[in-house]
Amino acid sequence: MSLLTTPSRTVSKPSTSERLIQAALEMFSVRGIAATTREIADAAGVNEVTLFRLFESKERLLGAVVQEVVQAESEALDRVDLEDFDIRRDIVAVAQVFYDTHHRYQAFLRTILAHRMNPKLTEEIVREAVQPLREKFIRYLAEGQRRGVIRENLDLRPTVDAFTGMIFAAVLRRAVYTPVYTSEAYLATCVDLFLNGICTRP
């Protein structure tokens, strides 16, 4: 066979774990934490035994769903090139990915926020899924401080939360009504406000 021959593409089927995570995402989006493992297993086309074999509990499955939700945001931070540090370019890219992710999963995020969860479960999910993402963002901003681009006296933990909060608020707002400005205009404003607030030379 010629080396230039284009191989036929095969589309791999989702694994059982992937099907369960997708089914859980859909069920949690509709029913919140009240969704049962039986409902999730049925939606994924597997039995409950398989669900428990792969994830042990509904709580661990919920954690896997949150991991899925934050994956794109984590990958966006992984793509940042610290050797070619350009804070405006990087923050614009990260803001867009964060907005797209929150918009894509807004039904899940709204429903989970509306349901009261066990505090220990919330703490575990934050520690295992959300905190690593925050730490990546904090490390990036710390590099900006090291380079003298970001104000040295800035506490980076609330800085990250303020940035993500602006974006999440926009997604929630657009779920209620459509503002007269575009999402692109809002994100550009968020980036300007953020950089003007944290940079030594905006």
Segments from the language model and where they lie:
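Basic, helix-initiating cap at the start of DNA-binding domains
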Residues: 1-34, 38-43, 49, 59-60
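Amphipathic alpha-helical segments that line or abut small-molecule/effector binding pockets
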Residues: 22, 88-110, 157, 161, ...
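Amphipathic alpha-helical segments enriched in hydrophobic/aromatic and basic residues
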Residues: 28, 36-37, 58, 62-69, ...
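Short helix-capping/turn signature of helix-turn-helix
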Residues: 55, 113-119, 129
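Amphipathic alpha-helical linker/stalk segments
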Residues: 65-94, 102
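Amphipathic C-terminal alpha-helical segment
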Residues: 100-101, 139-143, 160-181, 194-202
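Amphipathic alpha-helical packing segments from all-alpha helical-bundle domains
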Residues: 103-104, 120-147, 157-161, 188
